[in-house]
Amino acid sequence: MTRGAKKQRPSTATTELPNKRKPTPTSSGKFDPIKVATRENAAAVDANLPLERLLDAVGSRAQDVVEDGECVVYWMRMQDMRIEDNRALALASAEAQKTKKPLVVIYVISPQDYAAHDRGARRIDFMLRNLRIIKIKLDEMHIPLHVVTHSPRSTLPRRIISLLSLVGAHKSYANIEYEVDELRRDIQVCEIAKKDGMKATFVHDKCIVEPGVAVKKDGSYYAVYSPFQRLWLATLNDYQGRFLDPSSEPAANHKSVRKHEKLGELFNGTVPDSVEGFELDEDDRKKMAEYWPAGEEAALLVLDRFLSTKSRPEQAGGVNPLSQGAEESDKHSRIQVYGDERDRINADTTSRISPYLASGIISARRCVRSTMKLTGSSKVDGGRNTGIGRWVQELAWRDFYVSVLVGFPRVSMGRPFIEKYADIVWEGGDIPEVRAWKEGRTGYPIVDAGMRCIKETGWLHNRLRMTTAMFLVKDLMVDWRVGERYYMQNLIDGDLASNNGGWQWSASTGVDPAPYFRIFNPYLQSEKADPEGDFIRMFVPELKSLKGKEIHNPSAAVAKRLGYPLPIVKHSEAKDRAIRRFKTPGEK
């Protein structure tokens, strides 16, 4: 993208993605956002970055004097659901203290936004569980949490201003969400607030190093991870105060706020049990609550387990990450051996912190500070030679994918980063093989174990995410957007930037991708990641009696005897087909 490119008026034209899912019902009726932007529309958005427009809108009013109003509002979103180390919340609290006004927190449940980003019922239930805990904590500080549900999404900016008017606020603070639709929404909020004599402030919080900092000398965004990571780490170490210092926790309101004419009623509000169109059945709700306990305290405990205890085979599957029995170790904790064991799926070799990061229940800054405390160093270890450094690199990947989302927003509009691959001929998204993939009935044990793990736990080890994704795209030759959507709808840690980045990497269509001719062999991946087949036995019980290499690739006779499906595609033939179609996009 050329920064000095002539700005174009974005077209509203879109191209429908084949085999759209059924519309998601909401309180305002049916709403189906599944569209793919045209190449021209996406290019126009790339040439006029929404984040830059939002920052310009906020910066243009930075010195404006606005009357104090009756309170100060912090607008919490589903990516910053915490009280500790929350930049916008800290700023709102500081303003409230300076002006001697109460602090009010608002939260807007927007079903159409959830549908637009393919949020799943598990993610929404996790959001609600965390909101209830936040409400209790805020209540102890005499800070009301006002939760409302709003549709349609197109009128949400005006609704935000109406909520400010309702509580008598003239100033609001929120952390930036980097998706295109959300940035456009917040630009509108700024514009309406200005017309109404209010000020809406939006600040960076999600990333460790915010988008736009670790960029090339000409100001353009990196599309390759390695140079980004080197600059990211150097910047982080050179300016630790700016990027790593924790934000202050909010100060409590005076208890008299409970008798305030406008604000007192807000304490009586509740968090809904569910959101229409995103309900979980009772069994799944209980299961998710066990596997993924809510709250900041739970998130900190999950992180501490990763930093201080050894991995355990019994923790590989659907279990509470805080289960009893973890053995503490300084030298052999999961993070210390992360570099060697991170690709093994037969134990809890990774942090399991992703659901908490995706919902902002813990800050990424806190994660980095914890590694520094562990090393006892004044510098952040981001190298490849230590387990700690390798894990910090994963946090850098998270920032990298957000940077890509900001610098090349077309990737969040259904477009491949490498545009020539928009013409690849895919098989249909509703072919029987797609259902087999989703259900874990492909005849490839490692793929089936991974897909069944998603259905059971709402989570999947990153190595298996790559393996199952590449199988769908390269072996079945199914559009990567079909899988991207399925992951978002079923994973409790669904994050647009990371999910899109991962899928486009596997599909060879994205930034810093796997070359199109690099195609995982599921059998070899299985032997490397799950050598003894323990993970497969956990999720594919039909094969639990098998041992040795047979569990990775059972013969047709064995599969038939055990009631396990035969492979739905021959890997060698599928590989040749994929290479042929990627080599000449548009030809079959």
Regions found by a protein language model. Give the residues of each.
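Active-site-proximal binding-pocket segments
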Residues: N346-R537
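Short, flexible loop/turn elements at secondary-structure junctions
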Residues: M76-D80, I176-Y178, H204-C207, Q229, ...
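Residue-level detector of alpha-helical secondary structure
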Residues: L91-E95, I133, V302, S370, ...
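Trp/Phe/Arg-rich N-terminal binding region typifying the photolyase-homology
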Residues: T2-A252, S498, S572, R580-K588
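Soluble or luminal CAZymes and related metallo-dependent hydrolases
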Residues: F126, N130, D181, G295, ...
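Glycine/tryptophan-enriched, flexible segments
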Residues: A5, P10, D68-G69, S220-Y421, ...
